[in-house]
Each structure stands twice: as C-alpha cells, then as structure tokens.
A protein has these predicted regions:
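Class I S-adenosyl-L-methionine-dependent methyltransferase catalytic core
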Residues: 1-219
Length: 219
C-alpha cells in the first residue's frame, strides 16, 4: 500500500443490538459486526501523523473507542462535531413561520427550532443528535483554523447520510492534506473514497489487506 492519508473521515456501518434499529439500518445499507470492522486494515492507509474523524451513535460510545484504538489511533475527543438533526422539511416550515409572523421573539424561535429537530428512538430521552469523534495517530495534524465550531445544524438527507458541512469544516480545520472518506456514498472534490456505494474507489480494503487500486490496475 503506497497511498497514505493524513485525514481519514469514516462513517462505519454499525450493527445494532435490537431488531428495530438494526433492521432500519440494514434496509438501506449493509451493516457490519464490530469485529469485522476492526479487521479492516485502516492502519495501512493512515500516515504516521494523521487524524481519524469518525461518526458514531450514542449506543456505540465504547465500540467507537475500541474501533479507533484497533486501527492505531488514540481518541482525543468524543465530540469533535455534534450534528443536530433537523427534519427534512425544516427549512420550508421555518421560513414559512418567519414569513407569516409566527415568530415574535427569541423564545418563539427557539421553540420552533426545537420542534423541527428530529425525534429518533431512545430508552431515556429521544435522540436527535449524532457525534463525530476525533482521534490521532502520532502527532496528529496541525489545526489550521481556530474558529471551527462543534455544533452543526442540518436537515436529514438519505438514510444515515451525513451533512456535507462536516466534511467542509474538516477541510478548514486541517487544510489541504491527503484525505480519504471510508464507507463513502458519494464523491467530493479533493477526497479519495472507499465504500460499496461509491462510484470509484481509490483503494481496495479487505480484512488484512489494503491495495492501491490505481497501482493494481497499472501493473
């Protein structure tokens, strides 16, 4: 494996312990057991000094730490970014309320915003956020922008699709470094990609084996 990436942006296909959550995820993409995700040799993709930015859900805090460590990273913060999930039509309804004068003060606006956050499952409170941890290998990466904020408000896209804004903020945070998105679904300028739903993969990533696709095809 010749390609080494300084920034690895990952959205693992977590498997859930209950039938409802696991079934909902599996309806849209293939989930994987933790042990199988750990066996993917992400450590072969990572540069000596690199950053892992990885999504996880509130039910998988410990699993996320274990996975980062299995890939050779040390978790620095569990809340690099927090995505506040808005309903898909939140923009239309909020704009309508503002236009029609339904919002008369700051607290009206807060009530409206809270009403438009997604209501997911939960055994205690109902979940409406998802977090991205940041972990480092070696010395990590130098922060290029000191004004990048943690919280991202963004409507839901397709099932489990993450906001483009987070990828953009990572670019601002760490600069123009070699970067790859794993378990990717769509391409983005300046990024390499790997995943069974992306059109073109930069690498072939199998348990115990990472292969540069371009090098393989040229051989």
């Amino acid at each position: 494996m010749t390609a080494k990436y300084s920034l690895l942006y990952v959205d693992p296909p977590w498997s859930y312990g209950n039938t409802i959550s696991n079934g909902a995820a599996a309806d849209h993409y293939s989930t994987m057991k933790l042990i199988d995700i750990k066996r993917l040799p992400v450590w072969e993709l990572a540069a000596e000094n690199s950053v892992l930015a990885m999504w996880y859900t509130g039910t998988h805090n410990q699993e996320a730490i274990e996975l980062a460590e299995a890939w050779g990273f040390t978790v620095r913060t569990m809340k690099g970014f927090t995505w506040v999930k808005l309903n898909q039509n939140a923009e239309l309804r909020i704009n309508k309320a503002l236009t029609e004068g339904e919002v008369t003060d700051f607290y009206d606006f807060l009530d409206l915003l809270n009403a438009e956050t997604r209501m997911n499952g939960g055994n205690h409170t109902r979940a409406n956020t998802e977090d991205l941890l940041i972990a480092t290998r070696g010395t990590g990466l130098e922060r290029k922008h000191a004004g990048i904020k943690q919280v991202v408000y963004s409507p839901l896209g397709a099932h489990s699709e993450k906001p483009w804004e987070v990828r953009h903020r990572l670019e601002l945070l760490y600069g123009d470094v070699p970067r790859i998105e794993l378990f990717s679904r769509s391409e983005a300028p300046g990024w390499h990609h790997w995943g069974n739903q992306c059109a073109t993969a930069a690498v072939e990533l199998l348990p115990g084996c990472a292969i540069d696709v371009v090098k393989t095809e040229a051989a």
